[in-house]
Every structure is written in structure tokens, then in C-alpha cells.
């Protein structure tokens, strides 16, 4: 996402080099969406994997509509739109089959059975291999799997976003659904690289995110200070510690940290070598109640847990 939109200026050459470096390191899951850009991130991923398709699991999403100029156009889970969106994504990606196709947000105006039914037709047509949902509630997951197996649920999960713990993760495990954790580094905050809003580019959407605002920002800096302290004691970076915590939550949870630079991807990959003790985990668990602010503005919060 950050390679094309939301996080400041894009640099396609650097981004493609970063994707290639990720593949070199054995990273296989590449996550995109038709709204990133909008549309241009799928094209970027398509260029990056064109000569290395067998090394990549390509996941994309539909359902949040944006105009070419970036304007938000709402949520759409209607069957005819599902088919249209998939064909457009296939063309932009330049692939014959999408490995994992998500509904980006649940459409409250369309029964999930209808949306997933249309997605299942894409599997039958050979256009999609596996189906996923994003930010879906437990009851929605149960209704969805009654229509077609759901391979993955993608939802925000990190040291500073613990909402999935409890019923949501339990439901995924009960139904055999893998969990893909987006923003596992707290939109970059947990890396410790941001000390004020001035560290973010002018076009960076985080400037409007509640957790990056005013008092919330200052309180969350205290959380990051503790992450930095614990990381130093482990001999790793704060980002690696935050990812190691995700890995420690279970083998069925896959984090997808966003990166635009090869060196950051290499840093993140290093998290797989870090083992956390019970004491480490207890210290990190204590940070959750200290996080300040909602993860989205009011409009965005209405679209999660659908």
C-alpha cells in the first residue's frame, strides 16, 4: 500500500527493487488492493512479479470503491461488482489467477452469502484460488464459510491493536481460517522512527489518524519508549520485537508489515530469528492498556468488524 498511496511520494523503481529483495529473502505473500493508488499498486505488483510469478503468492482485495482521482465512492459487495472488480484486478496484475482474493470491507447492504457466492464463482472459473475477508466479525465469518471455505481473515493486529484477541481469533481457529495481521508495526509508530508529525510527509494519511494526534501521540510515544527499551535488551530493533511478538501469538497468524525499502524488508525478516521468553511476553502484554486513540477516524471505525 505504502508503495503507491497514503504514505507520501511513490518511487516505483525503489519499490520494485524492494519487492524483488523480499522474494530473494524467501518472503512469498505480496498483499495489494485495487484501492491502493487507486489501481496503480496492483500494476506495480504485477510488474514486480512478472518474471518471478512462481515465487509469489499474490493477494488483492475489492469492495472499497475509489474514483481515479482518489475520491471515496463507498463500499460495494454486489455480485456484479465482484465479477467486474476481479476482471479489472487480473488485468492490472497481469496474472491469470489471483492466489487470494479478499473482500476489503463487508458491505452492510448486501448479505455476505451473496458476496461470497459471487466470489466462489470466481474460484470455479479459475480466476481465483482462495477467498478471504477483511475486518469481518465472527458471525460474518460463520455465515461466509457456510457458502464457501474462507482461507484467511485480514484484520489489524499488533502490540497496539489487540481487538482480535478473544472471539475473533477463536472463531478463525474454530473454522480453520488463517489470520493475516495488517499494520503489525502500528502504521510504523512501533518502529520508534517517528517523534512528531513533522517526521511524516505532507501527503501522509497518518497525519489525520487519531493515534498520531496531539495528546494521543505523546502518550503513544511512552509506549514506544518501552518497546525500544525491551528491544535493546534483546539486541534487536523495535520493529523486529513487534513482529516477533506477532509470531509468538501462533503459527496461524501471518503479519504483513508494509515497507518501501529493501533494507527495512531485510530488518523485518530478521524478526523470525527472535525468540521471546515468558518474561518478554509479559512485559509486552503490559503495554496494551496504555495505547491512546482509536485506530481510525469515526468513518473508518464504522467499517471494521462488519
Cite the ranges covered by each PLM segment.
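N-terminal small/glycine-rich loop or linker at the start of catalytic domains
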Residues: 1-7, 59-73, 97
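Glycine/proline-rich, positively charged
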Residues: 69-163, 167, 178
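Conserved, mostly hydrophobic/aromatic
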Residues: 15, 30, 45, 58, ...
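Generic structural signal for well-ordered alpha-helices
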Residues: 19, 42, 46, 86-90, ...
Amino acid at each position: 500500500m505504502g508503495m503507491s498511496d497514503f504514505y507520501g511520494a511513490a518511487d516505483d523503481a525503489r519499490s520494485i527493487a524492494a519487492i524483488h529483495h523480499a522474494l530473494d529473502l524467501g518472503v512469498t505473500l505480496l498483499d495489494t488492493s485495487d484501492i491502493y493508488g487507486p489501481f496503480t499498486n496492483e500494476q506495480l505488483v504485477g510488474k514486480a512479479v512478472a518474471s518471478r510469478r512462481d515465487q509469489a503468492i499474490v493477494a488483492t482485495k475489492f469492495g472499497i470503491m475509489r474514483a481515479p482521482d482518489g475520491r471515496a465512492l463507498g463500499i460495494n459487495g454486489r455480485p456484479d461488482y465482484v465479477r467486474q472488480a476481479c476482471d479489472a484486478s487480473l488485468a492490472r496484475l497481469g496474472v491469470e489467477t489471483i492466489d487470494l482474493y479478499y473482500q476489503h470491507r463487508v458491505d452492510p447492504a448486501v448479505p455476505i452469502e451473496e458476496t461470497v457466492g459471487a466470489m466462489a464463482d470466481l474460484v470455479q472459473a479459475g480466476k481465483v484460488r482462495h477467498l478471504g475477508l477483511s475486518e469481518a466479525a465472527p458471525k460474518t465469518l460463520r455465515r461466509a464459510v457456510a457458502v464457501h471455505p474462507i482461507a484467511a481473515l485480514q484484520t489489524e493486529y499488533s502490540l497496539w491493536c489487540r481487538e482480535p484477541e478473544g472471539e475473533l481469533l477463536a472463531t478463525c481457529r474454530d473454522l480453520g481460517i488463517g489470520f493475516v495481521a495488517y499494520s503489525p508495526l502500528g502504521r510504523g509508530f512501533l518502529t520508534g522512527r517517528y517523534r512528531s508529525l513533522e517526521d511524516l510527509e505532507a501527503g501522509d494519511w497518518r497525519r489525520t489518524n487519531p493515534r498520531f494526534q496531539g495528546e494521543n501521540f505523546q502518550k503513544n510515544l511512552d509506549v514506544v519508549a518501552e518497546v525500544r527499551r525491551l528491544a535493546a535488551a534483546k539486541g534487536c530493533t523495535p520493529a523486529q520485537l513487534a513482529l516477533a511478538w506477532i509470531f509468538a501469538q501462533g503459527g496461524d497468524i501471518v503479519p504483513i508489515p508494509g515497507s518501501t525499502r529493501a533494507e527495512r524488508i531485510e530488518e523485518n525478516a530478521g524478526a523470525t530469528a527472535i525468540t521471546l521468553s515468558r518474561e518478554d511476553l509479559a512485559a509486552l502484554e503490559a503495554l496494551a492498556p496504555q495505547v491512546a486513540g482509536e485506530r481510525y477516524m469515526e468513518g473508518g471505525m464504522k467499517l471494521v468488524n462488519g
